[in-house]
Amino acid sequence: MILRAQANGGQPGSPWLVFLHGFSGDCREWQQIGEQFPDFSRLYIDLPGHGDSADIRVSGFADVCDLLRNTLFSYNILKYWLVGYSLGGRVAMMAACQTLPGFCGLVVEGGHPGLQREAERDARRRSDGRWAARFRREPLRDVFTDWYQQPVFASLDASQREALVALRSQNNGETLAAMLEATSLAVQPDLRARLNARTFPFYYLCGERDSKFRALAAELSVPCHMIRNAGHNAHRENPAGVVDSLAQILRL
């Protein structure tokens, strides 16, 4: 089984850019950014429970990484960078910590490396369980209206919140709930030690208004590109800033 994706060709010999969206997003999320790199072949993936992969269920990160590996193989992708936001960043970090043939490097925007204390895991398990229950039983517009009131999205203004609520409400609540539970931070291992011992290039993107993830980036001993005038969803709030950072990373 493979994940659904959209592919765009680039110059032969250049590595692929493999884009992984955040929770409740889909393969369209990164396309505005990816279009600015026409020399690179680009693969925009729908993660399980999302977009055209909504019917794909997983039991945890191991399943997601297996599906990612199968998808890359099916497209004959032999050399690539992983670029992921939030949930997609966590999947990318998990995958990068495994042995992946052809892997060139990792770019993560606002992705959590993992919780360190059991009490934090327990609290996150309860929180994600409550959200999952709401996704299953309530209108998605109501759930996402509350979702985007969380502190991590404090930099969004009213119109930005409304646009995201309208967009995310097109999802399937049941499949979102299943993916939220399967890939909760409560079940993700703490990746700090493995990432700090990495042998591959790793870059972090963070909105300057995203204080939580700025602090997390500092724990990773990784080059961090601060995106001006942006919060947690930097590639949406300041796409030009993210394009500039990616261009620097890819040495364009």
UniProtKB/Swiss-Prot annotation:
Give an example GO molecular function. Answer: 2-succinyl-6-hydroxy-2,4-cyclohexadiene-1-carboxylate synthase activity
Q: Could you tell me which InterPro entries the record lists for this protein?
A: AB_hydrolase_1, AB_hydrolase_fold, SHCHC_synthase_MenH
Entries under Gene3D superfamilies matching the protein: alpha/beta hydrolase
Determine the domain of life of the protein's source.
Answer: Bacteria
Write the Enzyme Commission number(s) for this entry: 4.2.99.20
This enzyme catalyses: 5-enolpyruvoyl-6-hydroxy-2-succinyl-cyclohex-3-ene-1-carboxylate = (1R,6R)-6-hydroxy-2-succinyl-cyclohexa-2,4-diene-1-carboxylate + pyruvate
Q: Which keywords belong to this entry?
A: Lyase, Menaquinone biosynthesis
Any one Pfam family match given in the protein's UniProt record, by short name: Abhydrolase_6
Q: Name one GO biological process term.
A: menaquinone biosynthetic process
Q: Which SUPFAM superfamilies match?
A: alpha/beta-Hydrolases (SSF53474)
Task: State which pathway it belongs to.
Answer: Quinol/quinone metabolism; 1,4-dihydroxy-2-naphthoate biosynthesis; 1,4-dihydroxy-2-naphthoate from chorismate: step 3/7; Quinol/quinone metabolism; menaquinone biosynthesis
Q: How does it assemble?
A: Monomer.
Task: Describe its function.
Answer: Catalyzes a proton abstraction reaction that results in 2,5-elimination of pyruvate from 2-succinyl-5-enolpyruvyl-6-hydroxy-3-cyclohexene-1-carboxylate (SEPHCHC) and the formation of 2-succinyl-6-hydroxy-2,4-cyclohexadiene-1-carboxylate (SHCHC).
NCBIfam families from the entry? menH_SHCHC, PRK11126.1
- UniProt similarity note: Belongs to the AB hydrolase superfamily. MenH family.
| PANTHER family given in the database record | 2-SUCCINYL-5-ENOLPYRUVYL-6-HYDROXY-3-CYCLOHEXENE-1-CARBOXYLATE SYNTHASE (PTHR42916), PROTEIN PHYLLO, CHLOROPLASTIC (PTHR42916:SF1)
This chain's protein is named 2-succinyl-6-hydroxy-2,4-cyclohexadiene-1-carboxylate synthase
Q: Which organism is it from?
A: Citrobacter koseri (strain ATCC BAA-895 / CDC 4225-83 / SGSC4696)
